């Protein structure tokens, strides 16, 4: 059982330690804790017994343990604070013209990396929730073509493919027609089911030879299931993570899955501190936060760093970036949905 004073002591030690990275002694706490040095030392000893503090080898001071950081995140972190003094600099960073969604997400990731010194990941709306709003096939050569998908009227995905040997030019038109008639307006998840249920029967009616047609459907739609992910500050991992964690970030789709699984459907923010799960990020801290992508859904920003982070400062920063990012995205999508020649 941690008393109120002990919690204040733990919070103060974490605050000092994350700024100085030096063990904290009782004298450093006396100005802020209205108790004698002996009382503070006794409370520090009790926190150490509970595993929330640990002794430094070269000093009489104490520093937070992993369990101490976990306790702090669970009991003391304020998710609703907004660092007003940082708003101006963040707004200024977004005060430029962006030409695609990925550039806006990259700016947010770069900004958080610069502020935190950590690695940052930004995720678009979950692929399965996005809707196919336009489709076309562009013939590139005698034997190659490009499938062009537009998702949510804003994101373009392409898939290059070899035209099957048994395909005539009219077969490409049939393929395009089926996709436009059956899939437009549907979510990627719906399309996934349709390819496995409706399409096998439909191609029997449309194609004289059905060899490779289902395989072609699977191939050209495969890219739509990939996460739209941007990263920044990967090299920072070398300062606080092992080689396995660094190499893990060479697999962006696995990184996206790890980040997404760390945030429940009903959570807007979460902080994981060395949660011990079987993961390359198990010994690290992950601060993740959802942000609104107007007209489309929610994305996720995640900061990955060492356990001894200044959590309150990072929560403040990610809150500000979230709000400014949503404002920028609102403007971006309002422009996309308007008549170009009426926008000034």
Curated annotation (Swiss-Prot):
PANTHER family: HEAT-INDUCIBLE TRANSCRIPTION REPRESSOR HRCA. Negative regulator of class I heat shock genes (grpE-dnaK-dnaJ and groELS operons). Prevents heat-shock induction of these operons. Coiled coil: none annotated. Belongs to the HrcA family. One of its GO terms (biological process) is negative regulation of DNA-templated transcription. The keyword Cell membrane does not apply. The gene is hrcA. GO terms for molecular function: DNA binding. This is Heat-inducible transcription repressor HrcA. Keywords: Repressor, Stress response, Transcription, Transcription regulation.
